[in-house]
């Protein structure tokens, strides 16, 4: 634990680590206070593409936690940055929330439902049969298929909801084209997170609640990994995977010793 506390940078997942639904998880406030007090570099990194950093900041504020907007990085931002680096000034047909559309717009990517360079799928309420059909036809005409993340499901207060991978699957199956996923566990998103923090992977830790995304992302990017049991994964689930986190904790409150 002392080795973890000496890390200069912390990349933290959000849902299941910081909050669940609209409820702040135990020990989180003390953990964030510790990050500030110890002058740690930290980033809340989420595979969700629906909300902007400003909206995430406001959500935490409503829960009584004040964190600067600069500490948030989403798969929408990662996707927009990736596409802009590949084809600056390109166009896209998008199925997703406002956070994704805003991120793409800020990178100079225009919306196009006739002959786009890319079809980009995120999460949101805009998903229906008509836009699936349009996406299929555009991909068959040559548009490249991008998913903001490869999560099959996401957490909800009353269970789970379909996430990006589940929503993009019909388009992949109908077109025979495999999507490229930008978010975790793609090391691309993690490397960008480390650059934002200004730390080397050996000086940072990845904290998350999912073995299939958070822990893989950390391991493949060279970070120490910390699995918290405050989210989707139970201790008995860990043995199902061929890899292990460096530490397993009940929650982030264990890191500064809140529960000790």
Model segments located where?
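Asp-based, Mg2+/Mn2+-dependent phosphohydrolase catalytic module
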Residues: 1-12, 17-37, 51-73, 80, ...
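Conserved phosphate/oxyanion-binding catalytic-loop motifs
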Residues: 48
């Amino acid at each position: 634990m002392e080795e973890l506390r000496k890390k200069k940078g912390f990349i933290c997942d959000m849902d299941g680590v910081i909050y669940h639904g609209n409820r702040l998880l135990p020990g989180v406030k003390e953990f964030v206070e510790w990050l500030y007090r110890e002058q740690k570099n930290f980033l809340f990194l989420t595979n969700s593409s629906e909300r902007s950093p400003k909206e995430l900041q406001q959500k935490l504020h409503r829960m009584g936690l004040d964190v600067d907007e600069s500490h948030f990085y989403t798969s929408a931002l990662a996707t927009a940055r990736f596409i802009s680096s590949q084809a600056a000034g390109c166009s896209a047909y998008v199925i997703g929330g406002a956070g994704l559309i805003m991120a793409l717009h800020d990178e100079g990517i225009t919306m196009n439902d006739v002959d786009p360079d890319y079809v980009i799928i995120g999460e949101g309420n805009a998903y229906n049969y008509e836009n699936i059909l349009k996406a299929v036809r555009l991909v068959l005409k040559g548009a490249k298929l991008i998913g903001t993340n490869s999560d099959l499901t996401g957490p909800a207060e009353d269970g789970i909801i379909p996430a990006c991978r589940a929503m993009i699957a019909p388009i992949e199956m109908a077109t025979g084209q495999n999507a490229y996923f930008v978010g975790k566990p793609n090391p691309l998103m993690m490397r960008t997170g480390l650059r934002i923090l200004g730390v080397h992977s050996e000086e940072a830790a990845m904290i998350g609640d999912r073995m299939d995304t958070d822990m893989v992302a950390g391991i493949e990017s060279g970070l120490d990994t910390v699995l918290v049991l405050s989210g989707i994964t139970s201790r008995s689930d860990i043995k199902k995977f061929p890899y292990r986190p460096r530490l397993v904790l009940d929650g982030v409150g264990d890191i500064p010793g809140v529960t000790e």
